[in-house]
C-alpha cells in the first residue's frame, strides 16, 4: 500500500508537470467566440483535476498504510498542503476562468511536492501525544486554510508581474525579484539535496540538546555549522566552522545555509543567461490578464481562507492543546506564528474593506502573508525547537 501511495504521488507530479506548459499555451492563445477560455485551458484544467485525484489517491492510500492521517511529518504535511492548493485552484478556476492562475499555482504545487520529497518518506508510528482524532481535524483544516490563502499569493504575484514597471529598476522591481530569488533558491535546495543524497554523504555528530541530553545527529551535507557542543564521529568529513546554540537544529540551519548559497549561484547563472530580471522574463505571460479580476481572485481567496485557517490553526489547535497538554496556549513558536498569521490577514481584510487598499497594495499584502506562512512552515518547523517541530 505504501508503494502504491508513492506511485500515486509520482503520477500526480507528472500530470501537473504536463499541465503547466499547457496552461502557458492557453495564456498565449485566444478565447473562443463567446469569450470563454480556449481548448488549451480546458485541457489544462482537465489535467489538473486528473492530477488532483492522483494526489488524493496518494493521500488515501498512505492513510490506509499508516493507520493515521498523513500529516505527521514534513513530507506528509507539505504534500498534503500541495494537494489542497491544487483543490483550491480548481474551485477558483471554475469561478473565474483564469488560465494564468493555473500556470503559477501548479508550478508552486510542483515545487511543494519536490521540496517534500527531500525529507524522509518512511511511514512511522505516531508518538502518543499525536494519537488523537484532533490530529487530522486540526492539521488538515489549517492546511486547507493556508492553501486557499496561498492562492491570494499567486494572484498577487500575477498582479505585480503585470502592474510593476519592468523598464527601470525601483524598490518594487527589487522586491518582486526577491520573490523570484526565493523560488530559485527552493529549486537550488532540491538540486543540492538530491546531489548530496546521490553521493551518499553522511556525517555523524554527538551533541547536547537544550535539555542537556546527549544524542547523535546525522548531517547529509558538509557541516558549515555544527550542533551544540558537537563532536564529529565520522572520519574524513568536514569539521564545522562554528557550533550553534541548543535552541537551533544545527543540521537544518546548515541545510538552509547551503540552500541559500546554491540559490545565489543558480540565480546568478540564470541572470547571466537571460540578461534580464526573472520577473521581466515572466511579464509577457501576464500581459493580457485583467488586473481587476486578478485583484478580485486574491481578495476572495483571503476572505474564504482566513476563517478556515482561524478555525484549524487557532480554535481546533487550542482545543487539542487543552486535551493533550491541559492548557489552551503555551507560546510555542508554532503557536506564536499561527497567531501572527491570523493577525496579519485580519489586518489585510481591515485595510482592504475599511481603508480601500485594493490593487497593488492588496497584492503586496498577499505576498507578505504567504511569506509568513512559508516562514512558519519552513523556519519554525525545521529550525526552531518546539512541540510542533518536525523531525
Curated annotation (Swiss-Prot):
UniProt function note: Required for the biogenesis of c-type cytochromes.
The UniProt record lists the keyword Cell membrane: yes
Compartments in which it is found: Cell membrane; Membrane raft
Knockout-associated phenotype: Cells lacking this gene exhibit a lack of cytochromes c but normal contents of cytochrome a and b. Can sporulate.
TM region(s), chain numbering: 7-27, 40-60, 75-95, 101-121, 141-161, 173-193, 254-274, 301-321, 328-348, 364-384
Organism of origin: Bacillus subtilis (strain 168)
Protein name: Cytochrome c biogenesis protein ResC
Highest taxon of the lineage: Bacteria
GO cellular component, one term: membrane raft
Pfam families reported in the protein's UniProt record: Cytochrom_C_asm
Subunit structure of this chain's protein: Interacts with FloT.
Membrane topology: Multi-pass membrane protein
Protein family (similarity comment): Belongs to the CcmF/CycK/Ccl1/NrfE/CcsA family.
